[in-house]
Amino acid sequence: MPIRVPDELPAVSCLRNENVFVMTSSRASIQDIRPLKVLLLNLMPKKIETENQFLRLLSNSPLQIDIQLLRIDSRVPKNTPVEHLDTFYCDFAQIKEQNFDGLIVTGAPLGLVEFEDVAYWEEIKEIITWAKEHVTSTLFICWAAQAGLNILYDLPKYTLKQKISGVYRHTTCDPFALLTRGFDETFFAPHSRYAGFPVEFIQQNTDLEILATSEQAGAYLFASKDKRVVFATGHPEYDPNTLADEYHRDVKAGLAPQLPENYFPDNNPNKKPLVSWRSHGHLLFANWLNYYVYQITPFDLAQMNPTLD
């Protein structure tokens, strides 16, 4: 899927070097096609790295996608140039009157922070509530999944004593589920979180359909029956070295982190990790875009009332 982004976005050259089809705004403007409008609320500290990861996964299908990057934290960033944010990101006030086909809310390193202590918690609540009327389907990733469950289903924060970190085997729950169509019966995905998502906890407190689980990591994929909200509790977007970078960062900070499970060859942190989750990540995003966004979103976004046949 050609992703439509500003001509000067750093991800353009990065992804083109990987042979990923990126369509700049200038080229897309000459095509008479209604692109899917996807809003990416980027909560990760390293904005540019996260942009690359998600744009890579959004690029692998034949439809055109118009990506809008959204920020809500007005504090001076430590890991991303202010000029980059000012050039490529919008504030919520600039888009709140618009409708979108899809919204992706990324993870955030806030696993041990209470919701009410998050600096932009009120803004998160406003956007997730806004999305119910303005977005066809919303995809929550990792910490955002926990935040979404709290805001939409009033579920309390479920924090584990020990961080889940590593690459875990998962099993699909329904061979005919659209979100996992084409998945192998077992597949791998990275996790890096303190949040717990026990299967029974989700089943007993929501009407969400659980679509994939892990014995070690709990519920991984679950979604509403009307396809309006989707939760992925891991990080299918992670690069090969993201977990390694997090581990070595925490070692340098003196936090004595546990070694990510099922990740480093021979459990040796000096060896290069092998990727076992890339194909599943691409397929997950392709299925979400096709079955949860494209097939139910209205052609005219002014008529926002997506329903299922």
From Swiss-Prot:
Disulfide bonds: none annotated. The keyword Transport does not apply. Substrate binds at residues 163, 192, 249. It catalyses: L-homoserine + succinyl-CoA = O-succinyl-L-homoserine + CoA. Pathway: Amino-acid biosynthesis; L-methionine biosynthesis via de novo pathway; O-succinyl-L-homoserine from L-homoserine: step 1/1. Keywords: Acyltransferase, Amino-acid biosynthesis, Cytoplasm, Methionine biosynthesis, Transferase. One of its GO terms (biological process) is L-methionine biosynthetic process from homoserine via O-succinyl-L-homoserine and cystathionine. It is an enzyme of class 2 (transferase). The record marks 192 as: Important for substrate specificity. GO terms for molecular function: homoserine O-acetyltransferase activity; homoserine O-succinyltransferase activity. This is Homoserine O-succinyltransferase.
